[in-house]
Each structure stands twice: as C-alpha cells, then as structure tokens.
Amino acid sequence: HNPRQCHTTKNWSRYLSLYQLGYGTSRGIGYRDSSQDLMGVMSHMPEEALELAKNLLSVQRPEGNAMHQYAPLALAEDNGNEANAGDSREKKGVLDEKGQPAYADWYGDDHLWIVLTVANYLKETGKLELLKEEIPFYEAGKKRAQREKGSVLEHLKRSLAFTHSHMGKHGLPLLGFADWNDCMHLPLGAESN
C-alpha cells in the first residue's frame, strides 16, 4: 500500500462535506469504510487511527452489531442521534408473501471490520491495555453517560457473538443488509458463502 494515499483516504474521503459530517443527516461516515481506511494507516499513524476506531466502537450497539453510518459532528455534540442504520431503512417494512420482513434491518459485516482494525492496532503497538478501556455502546436517544459501557475486549466479543448468533442452517453467517457489498440486498435468511 502507498502510505500517502492511505493517509489521504483516511483524512479526506469521508470528510469532504457537511453532508457526511453533519448533525443527524441522512448520511454520515460509513462504519465499514472507515474501519478499512484505518487498517491502511495503522502502521504509520496508529494513535490517530485509534481515535477514529474508538468513535466507531462507540456506535456499536449492545447486541454487537454496529450502526452503518455516523455523523462526527453529532458525535462530538453527544446529542443521542449521531448514528443511523444506513440504507437498510429503505427496506424497513417490506414484507414477503407470508407477511414476514423480507429484508434484514441490520448489517452483518460492519461490526466485524472493527475486530480486524483493533487487531491491527494491537499488532502495531503492542498496547494491550487498550482492551481494558471502557467505551459506551450506542443506544439511540441516550447521551453517552447514560449508555451501557463495555471494555474494548467486550465490544470485540459482542461483535463475534452477534455473527455467531446469526448463522444459517448450513453454519454460514446470515447476510444482513448490503453485507460485504453495498449493492447486495438479498432476502432475509440468505447465507454468506
């Protein structure tokens, strides 16, 4: 990888407009994208990358999955409305022929990328004390001080547990909404392979 290009991507690709930074906008900075960007800069700017990784951990839900997008300006304001479920909201309420939800309203891959990002940080720095640091989980409408907290290690465990609890009949992770590829919107119950 080209360190300069990775640095530019991390700093600019998600921060170009108030549309992505803004307060409770319909968009925001992508969880998956940001986690991937951080892995590209971890070797030469691990402490700066860690700050964004902590922001990402703070928009992980107590169930273990993560909000698909968050707005950094709203996160700084701590208004309880700094993250959203991304495009999965478009399919909310769509029912199949049996009257059941046709699509997942959660993303099944976002929360797994932060596991890789934190692992990269630990490999680069050896600072295992990070695993003990407490970070709140995301609960819409609540300020950070009111939210459940967990160690970084607990966040990572819940990430893996969420995937483990969403397995299909063939032992493969169920696909959430737009998992691994923003254009994939398979019916609820589809398995990764």
Where are these regions (language model features)?
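N-terminal, helix-rich and Lys/Arg-enriched segments in bacterial and organellar proteins
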Residues: P3, W12-R14, G40, H68-L73, ...
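Aromatic-rich carbohydrate-recognition surfaces in CAZymes
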Residues: I29-S34, L38-P173
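Active-site-adjacent structural elements in folded domains
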Residues: L16-S26, K98-P101, A178-N193
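Low-complexity, Ser/Thr/Pro/Gly-enriched N-terminal "stalk/linker" regions
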Residues: H1-T25, E51, N55, F162, ...
